[in-house]
Regions:
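Helical "lid/coupling" subdomains associated with nucleotide-phosphate turnover
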Residues: 1-45, 49-56, 62-268
Length: 268
């Protein structure tokens, strides 16, 4: 139940690695796991020590903001909006892209309400027979994206940095693999301050598990228990670690409500 268990991160002494599924695919054909490329924040190797944000979008949207010194983590309840939507046969990333299109076409207003023509039945999806995006789907996505935006805000505040000071943003999970990043900005799931530095990195949980297993075998073989304890300390070796419970934040409700709406500034 620890928040870090849902994040595809491997924490070692003042280091966090993020490994993408593409890197796993590139490397599994050879015995090159030890040299697998990783995006890392390390006080010894990183010249640009700007904070990195990692978001794993799913039923629980876990987020970690970190640099070589500190870490802040939280989890936002996103419900089923970011998982596959079984009743319409779409993934959350599909719904984000469709909502962005509907906003640009003015079929829904800035409050997320479908125009009268589509309010009862929903909007038909051209490439899916008898599939409609309904008002309920839109509302679920609004609730989820508002929770994520609140989480991002509280992380940056706890970390002591502005959103524009975050150097790179990685969106993980199956949702992240298929995410249209421009659509994510368009519907307000991600703030505009993240433009140009946001990357979808796929199923990093699987990738992280493979690297974890490999490193664990190496460390056990070395007989160095101290290194083993530090590597798998679940982030405890970050001297400045903050876990944020969004529901306990005094202004959470007001901020959450403020993020429900979409922007009204769209071109057809």
């Amino acid at each position: 139940g620890d928040i870090f268990s849902g994040i595809l991160a491997i924490c070692s002494t003042r280091m966090m690695k993020v490994v993408t599924s593409d890197e796993i695919l590139d490397k599994t054909a050879c015995d090159g796991m030890a040299t697998m490329p990783a995006i890392s924040a390390d006080d010894k190797t990183t010249t640009n020590n700007s904070p990195t944000l990692l978001i794993d979008l799913g039923t629980n949207a876990e987020m970690v903001l970190f640099d070589s010194d500190q870490m802040a983590a939280t989890s936002a309840a996103a419900g089923s909006a970011f998982d596959s939507i079984a009743d319409v046969g779409l993934f959350g990333a599909d719904v984000v892209a469709i909502l962005y299109r509907l906003l640009k076409e003015h079929r829904i207003d800035c409050h997320g309400t479908l125009q009268d023509e589509w309010f009862e039945q929903g909007v038909a999806i051209e490439y899916k027979k008898q599939v409609y995006i309904t008002q309920d789907h839109i509302r679920r996505m609004q609730l989820a994206k508002a929770a994520v935006r609140c989480g991002i805000d509280y992380l940056s505040e706890a970390f002591g940095c502005a959103l524009q000071d975050i150097g790179q943003v990685y969106v993980a999970g199956g949702f992240g693999y298929y995410l249209d990043v421009e659509a994510a900005f368009g519907v307000g799931l991600l703030p505009d301050a993240f433009r140009g530095k946001t990357f979808a990195c796929g199923n990093t949980a699987l990738s992280g598990a493979r690297v974890y297993g490999y490193d664990k075998l190496v460390i056990k073989a070395s007989g160095n228990g101290e290194i083993h304890d530090k590597l798998f300390s679940n982030g405890s070796d970050f001297p400045k670690k903050k876990i944020i419970n969004l529901a306990m934040e005094p202004d959470f409700n007001e901020r959450y409500i403020s993020y429900l709406d979409f922007s009204s500034d769209y071109e057809i």
